[in-house]
Amino acid sequence: GPVETMGFKAFNLARMAAIGLPVPQAFVLGTPFCQTFGDDPAAFRPALRKLLESQIERLEAACGLEFGSGRKPLLVSVRSGAPVSMPGMMDTLLDVGLTDATLRGLLRLTGNPRLVWDSYRRLIQQYAEVVHHNPAAPFREALALAMAATGARRPQELDFHALTRLARRNL
């Protein structure tokens, strides 16, 4: 059934959308697609690129934002999925599309420098850990040092200046 081909989270989001609940715009690269890509990545890469481009264009049109834009950047989440709920076991990348070139645009949209720099810091860490399989310890240590330097007891207490330094350090 559909849950096996799209994963538990995507399936439930689709069900919510079908009954009229507000859910974010999305698309799914289903299990058959991913299995085919996994069989021969080099041969299938052009089809993947074309599919991603068309789906990103659809999201841009629906949201009025543009992926990679310095003025109104579209940010996306990339989530792995499984047919059953597996809390904490599946990888997620949030705020994909946030780069040095899109930071100012997100700041203009949100007016919140702390949000922007914390999101960037988290994306850098997630990308390093999930995509490049870097250990989490250096990121945790850098966060602990930033908190100690500013007297923060929790990461939420770091101001955007500290988060900016932390994000730049982690790049």
What are these regions (language model features)?
Residues 1-171:
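Nucleotide/phosphate-binding sheet-loop regions of phosphoryl- and nucleotidyl-transfer enzymes
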